[in-house]
């Protein structure tokens, strides 16, 4: 039976560029959607730009243009980036749309009629110069706990403390610099606490389609923390309103009050799908009515679970709609084992990747090869990226077609032999359902491992039968025809298995194979006596220079923007990188050990996560013999060289500095002590 499925990715915010972190999610979603379509299911993939809120309003003001003009331009840029990575949306829309306004207001009215909305007077900080109430992130000041300067109004990035903006010491507006005033305002709240019983049942429940949980195990555990145990709940009611001036939709019957962006953003899924339905004739209500038998899945980042697994299902249910079938969260992307960094050039934008001429399907494959169904961070190791793409895609996969196609064209007029009884092909077809199950369950890493294992079997068959030698031997034409036909059929099957991940390659391969399209059926049937076209090279190798140029391009793109940020820091500028010969120029700083742990595979190294005050870094130090229990160093202050050139530590990662230690008479290395009162970032000397 054909399944009817609606799938979404989280909506990118309309005030920044798309980077590879965004691509993790959209590639994960796109692979799943393409697999469903290959299987013959009726599956729609909808997304949109998330366009409302204070940041968008202020960014447009800064550019001197209307918010509507800015978000239209940003949407074009976002869609171009996603399209460049072969993300196949059925509709990419905007939350600033008539459909979204209507749905947002309808849901609000339904919740209000269901006694799930109430108004309260609250106190907020107000910018007297800009005449606007300030969101938490637009208030800065001194942390009330650690007294770090220039911290946001909701949490301290130095000590991690959370607080309300009214608790900041010497607060100021990040918009104008003015001292904010505390004023009262009427706000509207969604009574989320009253939805706890429904949410406890939904979050721990299973979907009726296949009995699988609505949430991943890790997400369910987090929900239990937020929902509380038994009849008690820790859920707070949710402020869904903001005061003018605000770029968004005005709340019905409440002049000057606007829906908070997180109310209308998920409603954007409905709006995008409704826009698609109206264009191509789909029954929208069949997908969103209460009790719908269709499926609806949301792919999101782990940082927005709260909104998608609590607010959104409750909003839908108590406004008379269906709740999601499943909410699937993924982890964050690191590059070479570290958080993406603009200064290191590893904050890689999608646009820069495409402009540097790198094949988007290289990155699609690499990311998919790291993804599974768990909420785990994944790492883009640039050297591994080069070697894996070259080995798997070029060496193992496309090379099969390259090695066999020439003989078929030259010796057999481009026509294949019927090899439906091939033992080799039987091995490939036998894995069809197992690989399909991996894709279905979002176990892409396992699927690709299994596919490459099949490619290994095919390449072993090539080496064992040596078609280039058969071509030289008299009387071996029939055998040559058979072997090369098996290889072309094997290539077709592998292409079908890889098609969700490599859609453009599959399209190009279909032209070579003289097929209208590649479908999942091609994993189970042979081509028979079929004529193919002349082979054209399907994929180039990744070159080291391409990756080096990509990193350099991203460094250069942020150089101008980074300079002002460095000048605004309260800390002295870190000196230029120094070698050992320039030791006297070395810039030493106090750093706090956030975490210290042994390095797997090394008996000498310890890995330090350090807070320098102005930024966090990872440094490896060869002092493991002196500190058999590295956790005892957590919280300690150390002295580190802040401008020592980063070094790649074999397979362990990049060390961004050097920790100073003293060598004892016994040959032990001991960390230098720092007197009480010294703070992370203080200069030593």
UniProtKB/Swiss-Prot annotation:
SUPFAM superfamilies linked: Anticodon-binding domain of a subclass of class I aminoacyl-tRNA synthetases (SSF47323), Methionyl-tRNA synthetase (MetRS), Zn-domain (SSF57770), Nucleic acid-binding proteins (SSF50249), Nucleotidylyl transferase (SSF52374)
Binding sites annotated in the UniProt record for ATP: 342
Residues that hold Zn(2+) according to the record: 143, 146, 156, 159
Co-factor requirement: Zn(2+)
Short motif 'HIGH' region, span: 12-22
Highest taxon, organism lineage: Bacteria
Pfam families linked: Anticodon_3, tRNA-synt_1g, tRNA_bind
Cofactor: how and how many bound: Binds 1 zinc ion per subunit.
Enzyme class: ligase
Localisation per UniProt entry: Cytoplasm
GO MF term list: ATP binding; metal ion binding; methionine-tRNA ligase activity; tRNA binding
Presence of the UniProt keyword Protein biosynthesis in the record: yes
GO cellular component: cytosol
InterPro entries linked: aa-tRNA-synth_I_CS, Anticodon_Met, Met-tRNA-synth_bsu_C, Met-tRNA_ligase_1, Met-tRNA_synth, Methionyl/Leucyl_tRNA_Synth, MetRS_core, MetRS_Zn
Keywords annotated in UniProt: Aminoacyl-tRNA synthetase, ATP-binding, Cytoplasm, Ligase, Metal-binding, Nucleotide-binding, Protein biosynthesis, RNA-binding, tRNA-binding, Zinc
Locus of motif 'KMSKS' region: 339-343
Residue ranges annotated for the tRNA-binding domain, each copy included: 582-685
Gene3D superfamilies the record matches: HUPs, Isoleucyl-tRNA Synthetase, Domain 1, Methionyl-tRNA synthetase, Zn-domain, Nucleic acid-binding proteins
Self-association state and partner proteins as the record states: Homodimer.
Biological role: Is required not only for elongation of protein synthesis but also for the initiation of all mRNA translation through initiator tRNA(fMet) aminoacylation.
Family in the record: Belongs to the class-I aminoacyl-tRNA synthetase family. MetG type 1 subfamily.
HAMAP family to which the protein is assigned, alphabetical: Met_tRNA_synth_type1
Protein name listed in UniProt: Methionine--tRNA ligase
UniProt lineage: Bacteria, Pseudomonadati, Pseudomonadota, Betaproteobacteria, Neisseriales
């Amino acid at each position: 039976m054909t399944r009817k499925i609606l799938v979404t990715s989280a909506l990118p915010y309309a005030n920044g560029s798309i980077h590879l972190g965004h691509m993790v999610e959209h590639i994960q979603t796109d692979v799943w959607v393409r697999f469903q379509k290959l299987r013959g299911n009726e599956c729609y993939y909808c997304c949109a730009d998330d366009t409302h809120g204070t940041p968008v309003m202020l960014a447009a003001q800064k550019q001197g243009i209307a918010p509507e003009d800015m978000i239209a331009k940003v949407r074009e840029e976002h869609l171009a980036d996603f399209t460049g990575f072969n993300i196949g949306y059925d509709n990419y829309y905007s939350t600033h749309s008539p459909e979204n306004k209507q749905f947002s207001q309808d849901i609000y009215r339904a919740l209000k009629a269901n006694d799930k909305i109430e108004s309260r007077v609250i106190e907020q900080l107000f910018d007297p110069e800009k005449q606007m109430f300030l969101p938490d992130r637009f208030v800065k000041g001194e942390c009330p706990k650690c007294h770090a300067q220039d911290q946001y109004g909701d949490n301290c990035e130095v000590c991690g403390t959370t607080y309300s903006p009214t608790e900041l010491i010497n607060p100021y507006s990040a918009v104008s610099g003015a001292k904010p005033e505390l004023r009262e305002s009427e706000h509207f709240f969604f009574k989320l606490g009253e939805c706890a019983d429904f949410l406890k049942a939904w979050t721990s429940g299973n979907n009726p389609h296949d009995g699988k949980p609505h949430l991943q195990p890790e997400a369910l555990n987090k929900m239990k923390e937020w929902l509380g145990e038994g009849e008690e709940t820790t859920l707070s009611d949710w402020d869904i309103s903001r005061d003018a001036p605000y770029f968004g939709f005005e709340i019905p019957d409440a002049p000057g009050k606007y829906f908070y962006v997180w109310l209308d953003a998920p409603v954007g899924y409905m709006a995008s799908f409704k826009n698609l339905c109206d264009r191509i004739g789909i029954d929208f209500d069949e997908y969103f009515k209460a009790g719908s038998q269709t499926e609806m899945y949301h792919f999101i980042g782990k940082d927005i679970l709260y909104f998608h697994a609590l607010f959104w299902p409750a909003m839908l249910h108590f406004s008379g709609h269906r709740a999601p079938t499943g909410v699937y969260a993924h982890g964050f992307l690191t590059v070479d084992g570290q958080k993406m960094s603009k200064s290191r050039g590893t904050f890689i934008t999608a646009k820069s990747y495409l402009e540097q001429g790198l094949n988007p399907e290289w990155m699609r494959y690499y990311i998919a090869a790291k993804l599974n169904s768990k909420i785990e961070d994944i790492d883009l190791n640039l050297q591994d990226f080069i070697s894996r793409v070259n080995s798997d895609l070029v060496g193992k996969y496309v090379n099969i077609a390259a090695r066999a196609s020439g003989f078929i064209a030259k010796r057999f007029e481009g026509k294949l032999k019927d090899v439906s009884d091939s033992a080799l092909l039987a091995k490939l077809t036998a894995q069809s359902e197992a690989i399909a199950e991996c894709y279905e369950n979002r176990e892409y890493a396992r699927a690709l491992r299994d596919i490459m294992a099949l490619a290994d079997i095919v390449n072993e068959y090539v080496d064992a039968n040596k078609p280039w030698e058969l071509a030289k031997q008299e009387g071996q034409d029939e055998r040559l025809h058979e072997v090369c036909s098996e290889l072309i059929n094997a290539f077709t099957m592998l292409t079908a298995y890889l098609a969700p991940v490599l859609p453009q390659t599959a399209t190009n391969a279909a032209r070579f194979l003289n097929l209208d399209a590649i479908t999942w059926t091609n994993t189970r049937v042979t081509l028979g006596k079929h004529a193919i076209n002349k082979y054209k090279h399907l994929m180039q190798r990744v070159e080291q220079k391409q990756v080096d140029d990509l990193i350099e391009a991203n460094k250069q793109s942020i150089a101008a923007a980074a300079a002002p940020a460095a000048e605004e820091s309260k800390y002295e500028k870190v000196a230029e990188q120094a070698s050992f010969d320039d030791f006297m120029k070395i810039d030493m700083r106090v750093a706090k050990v956030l975490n210290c742990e042994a390095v797997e595979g090394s008996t000498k190294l310890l890995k330090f996560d350090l807070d320098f005050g102005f930024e966090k870094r990872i440094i490896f130090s060869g002092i493991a013999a002196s500190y058999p229990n590295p956790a005892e160093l957590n919280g300690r202050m150390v002295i580190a060289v802040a401008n020592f050139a980063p070094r790649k530590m074999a397979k362990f990662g990049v060390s961004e500095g050097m920790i100073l230690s003293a060598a004892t008479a016994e040959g032990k290395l001991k960390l230098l002590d720092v007197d009480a009162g010294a703070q992370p970032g203080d200069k030593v000397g």
